[in-house]
UniProtKB/Swiss-Prot annotation:
It catalyses: cytidine(32) in tRNA + S-sulfanyl-L-cysteinyl-[cysteine desulfurase] + AH2 + ATP = 2-thiocytidine(32) in tRNA + L-cysteinyl-[cysteine desulfurase] + A + AMP + diphosphate + H(+). Homodimer. It is an enzyme of class 2 (transferase). HAMAP family: TtcA. GO terms for cellular component: cytoplasm. Gene3D superfamilies: HUPs. Keywords: 4Fe-4S, ATP-binding, Cytoplasm, Iron, Iron-sulfur, Magnesium, Metal-binding, Nucleotide-binding, RNA-binding, Transferase, tRNA processing, tRNA-binding. The keyword Cell membrane does not apply. [4Fe-4S] cluster binds at C130, C133, C221. This is tRNA-cytidine(32) 2-sulfurtransferase.
């Protein structure tokens, strides 16, 4: 584990940025979307220490980059530290992330834990590694957040991840749930935030290409074919090509839930409807008014 690298001048994130108009248009869009997510869900507050989980993939690089740029212009003061979990995967290029962090004056930690061997051992033959791997990764990162005094743990999930999770739970889990933009961990010790919640994956792909991030592929799970999530993602990509507004509408639905129009008895008290109906009929004047309205409508026809 490496101690965080600090510039002698304090916060000094000044990367060499692309100069194209396409980059600045996209940057403006991403800043706006991330800013709205942070505001809508009160993700970052004055004095926060935000631990950004960096895997070396396009999503976490983009998240870290946008948050660091926000820190330069934000009206509040908050700290950012990048954390990578080195899971000891064979062939993992251990020098890539430290070099990127140091070249850009980004405080970082490398947390070394051999979760790769444990995942391989605990996963039954023929099953994917995702469940075991993610559980071990979460436990390691959440515990480390407590060690360094992080008040928020930032994850790189984007809008399309949230939608894909919704359909995974719908098709395979029998539940209506996705990934919330902000969440209290199950042990109630960490606040998890997803600042990219409003950002589309295709914009992240484009941004990562323009910024030329040193992407590290995931050889552990990326080599496994026919993952349920991969199939869902392919479905979403096809929808996006054929019906460009469909994913936007689906994500909007996740923010516009009507419990009374579903069938979850824990979410909505259906029994109270009977008492409400009886209360209405106890008022003879109210009942007379309703009948008058009905009679008028029939007369009009």
């Amino acid at each position: 584990m490496y101690a965080p690298v600090e510039s002698n001048e304090g916060f000094n994130f000044k990367p060499e940025l692309p100069t194209s108009s396409a980059y600045y248009r996209l940057l403006k869009k991403l800043r706006r979307q991330v800013g709205h997510a942070i505001r809508d869900f009160n993700m970052i507050e004055d004095g926060d220490k935000v631990m950004v989980c960096v895997s070396g993939g396009k999503d976490s690089y983009t998240l870290l980059d946008i948050l660091l740029q926000f820190k330069r212009i934000a009206p509040i003061n908050f700290d950012i530290v990048a954390v990578n979990l080195d899971q000891k995967q064979p062939g993992f290029p251990e020098d890539v992330l430290p070099r990127y962090m140091e070249e850009n004056n980004i405080p970082y930690y490398i947390l070394e834990k051999d979760t790769y061997s444990i995942t391989k051992r605990l996963t039954p033959e023929g099953k994917t590694y995702c469940a075991v791997c993610s559980r071990l990764r979460r436990g390691s990162l959440y515990g480390f957040a407590q060690e360094i005094g992080a008040t928020k743990v930032a994850l790189g999930h984007h809008r399309d991840d949230i939608i894909a999770t919704f359909f995974l739970n719908l098709f395979h889990g029998g539940s209506l749930k996705a990934m919330p933009p902000k969440l209290l961990s199950s042990d109630k010790k960490n606040i998890l935030i997803r600042p990219l919640a409003y950002v589309e994956e295709k914009d992240i792909i484009k941004y990562a290409e323009l910024r030329k991030f040193p992407i590290i592929p995931c050889n552990l799970c990326g080599s496994q074919e026919n993952l349920q999530r991969a199939m869902i993602n392919e479905m979403l990509r096809e929808w996006d090509k054929q019906y460009p507004k469909r994913l936007h509408s689906i994500f909007g639905a996740l923010q516009n839930v009507s419990p009374s129009q579903l069938a979850d008895r824990d979410l909505f008290d259906f029994e109270v409807l009977d008492s409400q109906r009886e209360l209405d009929f106890k008022d003879p004047e109210e009942l007379k008014k309703r009948l008058d309205v009905v009679n008028l409508s029939f007369a009009a026809e």
